[in-house]
Amino acid sequence: MRGISRLYWSLVLICFAFAPIVEASSVRLKELARIEGVRENSLFGYGLVVGLAGTGDTHRSKATLQSIANTLQQFGISLDSDEIASRNVAAVTLTAKLPPFANSGDMIDVNVSSMGDARSLVGGTLLLAPLKAVNGKIYAVAQGQVSVGGFSYDLNGNVVQKNHPTVGVIPSGASVERGLSTDLVGADGHINVILNQPDFTTASRIKNAINKTLGPGKARAVHAGKISVVAPAGEYDLVDYLTRIENSVIEPDRIATVVVNERTGTVVAGGDVTIDNVTISHGNIKVVISTDYQVSQPVFVREPGRGVSTVVVPDTSIDIEESVAEPVRLSSGASIADLVTALRQIKTSTRDVITILQLIKTAGALHAQLVIQ
């Protein structure tokens, strides 16, 4: 445990040692925002994976049997679902992302997930299946060999499994049949720039940078997450116009943030996070309750009466151990790294560090947004 604790504190100190490196610097607008209308669209579908070595859906998956019957019907073979018995087929759901500006003939990856009680999709092949958007229209068709990053083998009731063999992917397994139209210019004749992380200061700086690049009055900050830019009237090609916007240089502003992950005990903070004058005194109380059961056997001088019997008597003891709290004092302007170093010196546990950060935030001494995951 001592080695694990030493490793944890080493990692935390490394995080804070490099924190000043990630302070705000000048970046291009394309790293901070996107053009409205340029986005991915989700596609979904349903299909059958065939060629499984007895690891497909069982007869309990009625939807799979009906799907097999429907597929055979397309080839002129009429069978009732009750007449089908196969463990080499699995019903699957298909998901994919249609990228912006996709054209007919482009290939995209397809994720395949089992719907029924199949044990594995290893070695399976997806039959031709359509991929639809939320509007119900078909935008791509998928087919191909399923690649699974795991396996599952069952013999005489013994199962050996690695990762999730019921989920796979078909790289470049779907062909785009139609692309989605991308409207970069709105009905009002403006191009909207959407910030990845809305911030009023950053939005104002982006507006000023665009006006410096394109000319006064071209851009207007609508709110913290949106800047409206006048579309070119004809003197510029739209692509060249957007290129100039995307390559505008901005120094973004960001909120000082401390991120805490309670599950892993990780604490990450930027170099600009400071703490006011604060004194921390954190102690631990350990309560140990133990019970021993003693047998009470009465001594008889003569014949025992009716109310005399052997009984079990519990003997309970409570021990309380309180460790002496060692105070930690930090002066105004101290950083989170200073706090972690001070807590390391008094051998504070990971859980206590998280608790102390929460209390400092409650006391108003932590000038940062505390995010607990």
UniProtKB/Swiss-Prot annotation:
GO terms for cellular component: bacterial-type flagellum basal body, distal rod, P ring; outer membrane-bounded periplasmic space. It comes from the Bacteria. It is found in: Periplasm; Bacterial flagellum basal body. It comes from Hahella chejuensis (strain KCTC 2396). Belongs to the FlgI family. This is Flagellar P-ring protein 1. The gene is flgI1. Assembles around the rod to form the L-ring and probably protects the motor/basal body from shearing forces during rotation. Keywords: Bacterial flagellum, Periplasm, Signal.
